[in-house]
Amino acid sequence: MFKLAFTLTLCLAGSLSLAQHNPHWWGNRNTIVHLFEWKWLDIAQECENFLGPQGFAGVQVSPVNENIISAGRPWWERYQPISYKLTTRSGNEEEFGDMVRRCNDVGVRIYVDVLLNHMSGDFDGVAVGTAGTEAEPRKKSFPGVPYTAQDFHPTCEITDWNDRFQVQQCELVGLKDLNQSSDWVRSKLIEFLDHLIELGVAGFRVDAAKHMASEDLEFIYSSLSNLNIAHGFPHNSRPFIFQEVIDHGHETVSRDEYKDLGAVTEFRFSEEIGNAFRGNNALKWLQSWGTGWGFLPSGQALTFVDNHDNQRDAGAVLSYKSPKPYKMATAFHLAYPYGISRVMSSFAFDDHDTPPPQDAQERIISPEFDEDGACVNGWICEHRWRQIYAMVGFKNAVRDTEITGWWDNGDSQISFCRGNKGFLALNNNLYDLSQDLNTCLPAGTYCDVISGSLIDGSCTGKSVTVNEQGYGYIHIGSDDFDGVLALHVDAKV
């Protein structure tokens, strides 16, 4: 009897973890955008006016729970919780719930960045949060939850990143480290996440997951409610989980400890795609992209060119500040069938601590748009760059097809097909790409969605004529604005 019960428990845990890899997208949609630090009302409008019509699958939103108020309002104050009240600079609970409903109604799922590892760091005296809650972080006193010192791990500093105890039980950059093995802490975290599920979210990005024991996270995830069917989720749907685990391949705490619980952020993807499109690796090597590079299996990998953290660091990672290679890397990211794709939508920053665009009263301001739909008032909005949102459409058009017809020049000019539905060419050399290439597409004329759009049957950019054999003449000059060309069956003239 015990053996049977144990077996059933294992089977249930396994089925739940598999379900937590499902992002619950509508139809053929398959790209998430991180609208970093946007207000809830603005996200609702963006879902209705842009993301839904352009075929985006979901939005990762900034942390929703009350946070400490820091001088100058740096972005990272959102990662210093003070309670689980849903009031931040992005809005209150009513506005959040309205946003989730409106986005779900147009087929755009919401994934919340959640902080389960810690509360805020030290603060002199009494700290006040964005909902007016008081706390004394130095004493580990957070009455808004409530948490007291007994709910935290003993105070210690991470000095050795190869020491599992330090990584998972000491304080990450001074943030008060919760004890997730405590029944009380578990109950409060589950209560918080379940409330968000009731409001209609599709899942969670789990911040600092590697700093929590995988067995504690497994307990928390498996205890969560199913998704809310009132928001269009099928019965018994589990929340999509993707976990921040920074693993460069030599970490004591490995990404592999978390990959069966949900998807894992594949940071090596970000680093290597940056290396390639900065010219440090020939693009020809990308033919084996994905698991051939030692990355996680596709369905377990959350992939990105940059995120809100590493875009602020020095190194190979690309960001909006290098627009041509960034757009090329993003085009490859969205065209190559590997991973669960997320694109970044940033605000301009000059240093690591730059706050989001704000007014004189330190209130976040709404993005404004020019006549072409681009953001103009401190918001970068990469997701509104034509070269990026067009590739979201490309990814939708070629869903469930494989790579065929790979071509390269032995260096950094490459092209490939996605079945007979799409074609991508890239030129990262200092000389032109001018070649008859197999597009694998049916005969006809196609609009290059990178340089223009198909409007009323006419292409506003380049077009390529494909012959009966599937070949077309492809030209990408070394000094072209974008360095990439993309064709697909939904952009046939």
UniProtKB/Swiss-Prot annotation:
SMART domains: Aamy, Aamy_C. InterPro entries: A-amylase/branching_C, A-amylase_C, Alpha_amylase, Glyco_hydro_13_cat_dom, Glyco_hydro_b, Glycoside_hydrolase_SF. Disulfide bonds join 47-103, 156-170, 375-381, 417-440, 447-459. The active site is at residues 207, 244. It comes from the Eukaryota. One of its GO terms (biological process) is carbohydrate metabolic process. Binds 1 Ca(2+) ion per subunit. Binds 1 Cl(-) ion per subunit. Ca(2+) binds at residues 117, 168, 177, 211. It is found in: Secreted. The record marks 309 as: Transition state stabilizer. Belongs to the glycosyl hydrolase 13 family. This is Alpha-amylase-related protein. It comes from Drosophila orena. The lineage of its organism: Eukaryota, Metazoa, Ecdysozoa, Arthropoda, Hexapoda.
